[in-house]
Amino acid sequence: MEQTKIPSITFMCRVGDEEPEDGGCAIGGDFVPTTTDQLFGGKKVIVFSLPGAFTPTCSTYQLPGFEQGYEDFKAKGIDEIYVSSVNDSFVMNAWAQHLGIKNVKLIPDGNGELADALGMLADFSVITFGKRSKRFAVVINDGVVEKAFVEPDATDADPDPYGVSSPENVLKSIS
């Protein structure tokens, strides 16, 4: 995956959602087509992807860890950090609001196009998830993958491997 040019993919990102005063779900805002070229061109970014929003490892460790380490990554020359998941923008936005995410930006890869382009789309049908992204992180410099951190495949002994793509591991590899 390293040295792979990210193809031009368009995501439908929902912007303008605000948390409602009555505690209900935020449903306002507009869909804005956003391309990988807009997100990654001319910048050094981290994209990490995971099987699903609101899932245990993703919600307890991975997304909160990248959010907490945001300034450390910025100090090492990273311009932005993105989380991608094969979920729609409503789910992604609700997840970020639920976790209080302010710095990590969301990529709703609802059709799995980014995951597929990177060879990371996997079949999670055995647990009724359908097609989802494997857990990974990449450092992208001006649209090209510089470094890749891909978790090993799940096994009976370790059904949700996590460590290779952790924020701590990614951070220590950036010079």
List the predicted regions and their residue ranges.
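Chalcogenol-based redox active-site neighborhoods
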Residues: 1-175
